[in-house]
Amino acid sequence: MHTLVFLSTRQVLQCQPAACQALPLLPRELFPLLFKVAFMDKKTVVLRELVHTWPFPLLSFQQLLQECAHCSRALLQERPSTESMQAVILGLTARLHTSEPGASTQPLCRKHALRVLDMTGLLDDGVEQDPGTMSMWDCTAAVARTCIAQQQGGAAEPGPAPIPVEVRVDLRVNRASYAFLREALRSSVGSPLRLCCRDLRAEDLPMRNTVALLQLLDAGCLRRVDLRFNNLGLRGLSVIIPHVARFQHLASLRLHYVHGDSRQPSVDGEDNFRYFLAQMGRFTCLRELSMGSSLLSGRLDQLLSTLQSPLESLELAFCALLPEDLRFLARSPHAAHLKKLDLSGNDLSGSQLAPFQGLLQASAATLLHLELTECQLADTQLLATLPILTQCASLRYLGLYGNPLSMAGLKELLRDSVAQAELRTVVHPFPVDCYEGLPWPPPASVLLEASINEEKFARVEAELHQLLLASGRAHVLWTTDIYGRLAADYFSL
């Protein structure tokens, strides 16, 4: 939906040279819509000039590229255009190399207005991208190049020094880009372009390099640290965690492959684990913790008891949890605050079922997102859990992929979920009815790799669709797609 104001703005930008000449004459209240239209339509000349002459202290992608009164399209839910992103960066560069942007034509109130360029919140879904769009990796590289070029570019034009601009970004780094990003962070110190990282994701990065980057980040800006595929173990984590703990405003910590299994204790391992726990107790603002693929069997109470405040998002995928871990979590202060819970890869079919049901009961009032992929839940366990599951009245997302459920079990789930008015997405498994010669109970690996009878599954999809229509729930997405943009990030809940 576009308003007349939007359509008029789009028409004004058709001739970019004329639009640029008109910018000084336009009321600054039009600049936000001008920016959105120029970004959407790839009007790169206008976009560059808008950034160059921006009349407000803040230019925020999250504010400008969302759905608005004039345009229902939310550009933040799409990958950004490479052309538009480059135009924004060029506009910033031009501003920094001009002591008084547009001084000859701009009203006095517009001079030096921009103080913060907030480029955070861009889509980062990890799926295959259109070649004309920019990934978070590309965005990191582009901003890093700008920082380095600003430092190496020599003196600005004669006159007063440029007013510094803080650039807030979400950074992605791996082995290949580490040295480049480190140079950019160093270059931004004392530079008119100050790089400020909100969310850091480091993949396959050695321990010493991770520490070096953390030391360069502003302690007041960082909101999330996400360390992936680093296989740190407790020893590596005990080296890194004190550098993470200095970020007192950190709200999200995502770690993986932390081995603290009490079944194979060692003196060094226990010392490292105790040190890790002590450092975790330093966080005062932590609301999300992800410990995927970490052996936490029988240790969850030690981990969560150290935290100063209740978590709202907890991801414990493939952590080999024991019944006592689930019982502790159900009784802990965290349960009543959980909005997002991921227990994927933990066997919930046997002695863990009752403790899991207790946890679900304890978090029913707040839970919005529940991920139970590959938890070995068959029809019997699902049906026994449905009375509690349907009490999660605010639940929006339910992930059940990789569980041995039949068509009958899925239909029962669909019928019972009608009472959950907020439910929007159910990621369900291929029903066991659609496999040929399936062993029982089927291992998760078989469910993920075995061939599906496409004709049977087509009938299943048609029947589920008819049931959704009949129950007035056609707006709810039932899908087997685990790679789509369905799972919500904690900060978007």
UniProtKB/Swiss-Prot annotation:
<feature type="repeat" description="LRR 7">
    <location>
        <begin position="340"/>
        <end position="360"/>
    </location>
</feature>
<dbReference type="GO" id="GO:0034122">
    <property type="term" value="P:negative regulation of toll-like receptor signaling pathway"/>
</dbReference>
<comment type="similarity">
    <text>Belongs to the PRAME family. LRRC14 subfamily.</text>
</comment>
<feature type="repeat" description="LRR 5">
    <location>
        <begin position="283"/>
        <end position="307"/>
    </location>
</feature>
<dbReference type="GO" id="GO:0019900">
    <property type="term" value="F:kinase binding"/>
</dbReference>
<feature type="repeat" description="LRR 6">
    <location>
        <begin position="308"/>
        <end position="339"/>
    </location>
</feature>
<feature type="repeat" description="LRR 2; degenerate">
    <location>
        <begin position="194"/>
        <end position="218"/>
    </location>
</feature>
<feature type="repeat" description="LRR 1; degenerate">
    <location>
        <begin position="111"/>
        <end position="146"/>
    </location>
</feature>
<comment type="function">
    <text>Negatively regulates Toll-like receptor-mediated NF-kappa-B signaling by disrupting IKK core complex formation through interaction with IKBKB.</text>
</comment>
<dbReference type="InterPro" id="IPR050694">
    <property type="entry name" value="PRAME_domain"/>
</dbReference>
<dbReference type="GO" id="GO:0032088">
    <property type="term" value="P:negative regulation of NF-kappaB transcription factor activity"/>
</dbReference>
<dbReference type="InterPro" id="IPR032675">
    <property type="entry name" value="LRR_dom_sf"/>
</dbReference>
<dbReference type="GO" id="GO:0005737">
    <property type="term" value="C:cytoplasm"/>
</dbReference>
<feature type="repeat" description="LRR 8">
    <location>
        <begin position="364"/>
        <end position="391"/>
    </location>
</feature>
<feature type="repeat" description="LRR 9">
    <location>
        <begin position="392"/>
        <end position="416"/>
    </location>
</feature>
<comment type="subunit">
    <text>Interacts with IKBKB; disrupts IKBKB-IKBKG interaction preventing I-kappa-B-kinase (IKK) core complex formation and leading to a decrease of IKBKB phosphorylation and NF-kappaB activation. Interacts with CHUK.</text>
</comment>
<keyword id="KW-0963">Cytoplasm</keyword>
<keyword id="KW-0433">Leucine-rich repeat</keyword>
<feature type="repeat" description="LRR 4; degenerate">
    <location>
        <begin position="247"/>
        <end position="282"/>
    </location>
</feature>
<protein>
    <recommendedName>
        <fullName>Leucine-rich repeat-containing protein 14</fullName>
    </recommendedName>
</protein>
<keyword id="KW-0677">Repeat</keyword>
<dbReference type="GO" id="GO:0005829">
    <property type="term" value="C:cytosol"/>
</dbReference>
<feature type="repeat" description="LRR 3; degenerate">
    <location>
        <begin position="219"/>
        <end position="246"/>
    </location>
</feature>
<dbReference type="InterPro" id="IPR001611">
    <property type="entry name" value="Leu-rich_rpt"/>
</dbReference>
<dbReference type="Pfam" id="PF13516">
    <property type="entry name" value="LRR_6"/>
</dbReference>
